[in-house]
Design a protein with these regions (language model features):
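Conserved core segment of the aminotransferase class I/II
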Residues: 39-104, 220-221
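PLP-dependent enzyme catalytic core of the Aspartate aminotransferase-like
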Residues: 155, 168-228
Length: 228
């Protein structure tokens, strides 16, 4: 904040997962310390319902006026029904109590994923230990490419987001993002088992070809899954 203050820059604080931390208290928002320089974004899609695409903005007055104009031009008639649903929910229900239940549920699912990764992933694989939110960031063994491996993972009926989706310069090809938001602990463990098997197969291929899977012929692929 001090650097942005000296450079006269605004800070955009996008914090949809801020209330879903696994510690006793949520992290303090940057805007709590700098009202005039921080634009804070929040969402009910993570703490109420995923289909409830309603969010909010806290911004300095001058910025807020510009945001209102931009919103009016990009979304002529935002749905009032969903906004009224959120309003009724906040007024009539213990929404903080609901958030606490979500935090416990996601903590259990995070622990299930971390335990499965520890038990099943081959050597050379590493991952983060998230303190909140929905995701684990996993780094594959050296020389592996997450994008090249994805079709074979889908064939095994498990999916992820390659790390390159989160960078503008192509970085992250060795990384993947895993979600523990929706599956039960049992399905999380099964998904990790399938992913670990795919990674082990990729490592075997690398030993045979002496190169990363990115360099394999384009025609190389596993058979499609039997969906019958």
């Amino acid at each position: 904040l001090e650097i942005c203050r000296e450079a006269d820059l605004l800070v955009l604080e996008d914090n949809p997962y801020g209330l879903l931390g696994f510690d006793d208290e949520p992290y303090r928002a940057l805007r709590a310390d700098e009202h005039d320089r921080v634009v804070y974004l929040g969402s009910f899609s993570k703490t109420f319902a995923p289909g409830m695409r309603v969010g909010w903005v806290l911004a300095p007055h001058a910025v807020r006026e510009k945001l209102v104009l931009a919103q009016e031009s990009s979304t002529l008639c935002p749905p009032t029904f969903s906004q009224q649903m959120v309003s009724a929910y906040l007024e009539g229900y213990d929404w903080l109590g609901q958030v606490k239940q979500f935090r416990e549920m996601y903590r259990e699912r995070r622990d299930a994923m971390l335990g499965a990764l520890t038990d099943m992933m081959p050597a050379g694989t590493s991952w983060t230990v998230p303190t909140g939110g929905f995701y684990v960031w996993l780094r594959l063994p050296d020389g592996m490419d997450a994008g090249a491996m994805l079709p074979r993972a889908v064939t095994a009926r498990v999916a992820y987001v390659p790390g390159t989706a989160f960078y503008a310069d192509g970085f992250g090809s060795q990384c993947i993002r895993l979600s523990y938001c929706f599956p039960t602990p049992e399905r999380i463990r099964e998904g990790v088992r399938r992913l670990a098997s795919v990674i082990e197969q990729e490592l075997e291929l690398r030993e045979v070809f002496g190169t990363s899977t990115r360099a394999l012929p384009p025609s190389y692929d596993a058979p499609g899954p039997d969906l019958t």
